[in-house]
Structure formats: C-alpha cells, structure tokens
C-alpha cells in the first residue's frame, strides 16, 4: 500500500513525470538524430511514436501503479498473484537502479563542469584534457557524491511532497533557461545552417528503415517507459486524475523539451563551424568549445550546465524513488532508511565505474538489455496478465468519456509488439535509444 501520500495536483504530477522523462537523451541525442535522419521528415515518425507510447505506454504504467497503490515490486505481485509475482518485479527494479548508477556518474560530470565554469578552468584550458581528467577512475568523487547527496536529501522526507515541489521549481526553470539559450543562439552569424540541419525536410529519409527505427527508439526511451519508474508515480496519483490526458501532456512537454534542446544546441554548433555529434561528446566537448568562442561564454556555459543538472536531478529522483518505495514496502523499513541504503549502494557501485569507458559499457548493458526487457515485461504484465477489463476500469476513472476499443488494440497488440521489436532491434543495432 502507498505509504508516501499523493500528488496534490495534476500539474504537480505532470511536471514530476516530465521531470522523469526529460533527460540526457533529449539533450545529447535528439538534436543530432533530428538532423541526421531527415530533419523535419524525422519528426513524422517520431511524433507518431511519441503519441502512441505516451497514450498506451505511459497510461498503462500510471494505471497499474494507481490500481495497486504501490510501486514496482508490489504492482507486479498484484498482477501475477502467485509466488512468481513476488520476484518478477525485481528485474524492472534492477533496471531503475542500474540506470540510476550510471546516471549519477554522468550527472557528476555535469556538476564538475559547473565547477569548471565557476573556477574558470573549463573554458580557459584544453577542453578535451579537462574532459579526459574528469572521466578517469575515481577522478570525480566529490562532485559525484554531491549529486547523490542532493538527490537523497530531496527524497529523504515525504516522497510526493518533495518530488512535487522540486519538479514545480526545476522543470519550469529548465524550460526558461533553454528558451533563453535558444534565443541567444538564434542571433549568432551562421546559425541558419543549424536550423537547416534540423528542419529542412529530406523526404527520402521517410523511406529509410533506420529513420523509423531510430525515431521509435528515441521516443520509447525518452518517455521513461521502463516497467518501473512511472508505476511508482502512478501509485501516488489520486483517482480523479484523467490518466490518458496526463500521459499525453507528459509526452507533449517532453517533446517540447527535446525541441528546445535542438534549437539551443545545433544552431550554435553550426555557427562556429563545428561538426555536429551526439552523446557525451556533444555535451562535454563540442558545446564547451562553442561557449569558449562566444561572447559571455562563461555565462551561457553556466546557464547550460545548470539547465542540464535540473533535467538530470529530476530524472534521477524518479529512478531512485522507484527503488526506495519498493524496498520500503518489501522489507518494512522506514523511508529514511530506504533512501539512505539506496543512496549508499548507488554511490559505492557508481564510484567504481566512474571511468568513462566503464560507465559507457555499463549504460550499454542497462539500456540495450535490461531496460527494454523490463519495459516489455511491464507491457505484457499490464495488457495480458492484469487484463484489459481491469485496466480499462482504472483508465476510465477521472475521465468524462471512457477509453474505447482503439485504445485496447493499440495497447494490447501494437504497443506490446513494438516493445518486442525494440528489444530485438536494440540488440541488433547495439542500442537505438
């Protein structure tokens, strides 16, 4: 049963879910893929998949959490109603913990970059050398510790109250800061080339299977559909909230965040004649080089990394909350003890994988194998083990009009099938998210 209270408002709930969904993938992957796979043409499959996964994927996980009134472990046990059900939820929970461990390392790099900007180290010295030094084994322990200390401190008290308040501040701040960055970047000479890269449609890419594969993977992982994290937020949801509507609002704001990141990043990269890339190199090597060359570069670099830290912290809160809530209920311990134990375990493991190559391999295993399998497990559990009748009853709460047979078809057959495809393609392509 839910021991951590409920979200006080639908706005607070949606912002918390947006906070979970908006993360590194929106910032360092979406802008590059948007340009690389056809510009505006890429948006067609991307928006189709975002709408589909938001409607029937997020809604299903929220509904399961609210119905079971508990998070990952309890929700799977609620559905399966046998001994198997007591253990099956551990895989999605492992995914949440695994991604949190890797995420905390990357957020540690963000915090170290903020420190580097404030101390004038980052932009006045050799940027690749700064990044190399930062990503060595045990080279960033203080900033790494600070990331987990801040996150656990925010989770230490009442779960829903803290999560709601934090996201009501950090998510609007994230959007405001990125809007400011996007406006400033639009004034650069040569920024038009970045807009062309992003938005000039290359319609031939619609006939390229990789465009659809990458759009599907980007949309799926962008919404934090993991069979775990969004279930626990659903457990904190009141019965009068329209879940499908809230799910689509989450998907819309997540897409806006990704577009803002694209508008702030790629025109800046092109205006300074730097080749666009994706992944950590974009955030920690390419963009600092851009900031180094622009007027008031330190100021805008600080803006950027603070914005990224907001997105990262709100995502990490959800990952750790999924674990803490489950441990709190499974082992009958206090919330403070659950948060403390989770924080210590996360820190000990993540410190050992601080090396950039090691954490990269760690994240590959988690995102290519564990998370997609856990998401598939969640989809099957909700649409086939729990069943449509019970799910529909929960989805109809708070709605003026009940969900119809189209929702059932899209969820039970299209969504579950695509979850299988995403798992297979992720392995074949060595990651599509």
Mark where each language-model region is.
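Inter-helical loop and helix-membrane interface segments of multi-pass membrane transporters/permeases
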Residues: 2-5, 33-37, 67-91, 104-162, ...
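Membrane-interface "cap" regions at the ends of multi-pass membrane proteins
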Residues: 1-29, 57-62, 66-78, 83-87, ...
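Membrane-embedded translocation segments of transport machinery
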Residues: 2-7, 11, 164, 168-313, ...
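Helix-loop-helix connectors at the membrane interface of multi-pass transporters/channels
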Residues: 74, 107-135, 236-240, 245, ...
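Loop-to-transmembrane helix boundary motifs in multi-pass membrane proteins
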Residues: 6, 12-14, 20, 138-142, ...
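C-terminal membrane-solvent junction of multi-pass transporters and transport-like membrane proteins
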Residues: 88-93, 323, 330-343, 365-427
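Transmembrane helix-boundary motif of multi-pass solute transporters/channels
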Residues: 9-49, 228-234, 241-248, 252-255, ...
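Transmembrane helix-loop boundary segments of multi-pass membrane transporters
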Residues: 29-46, 80, 161-170, 245, ...
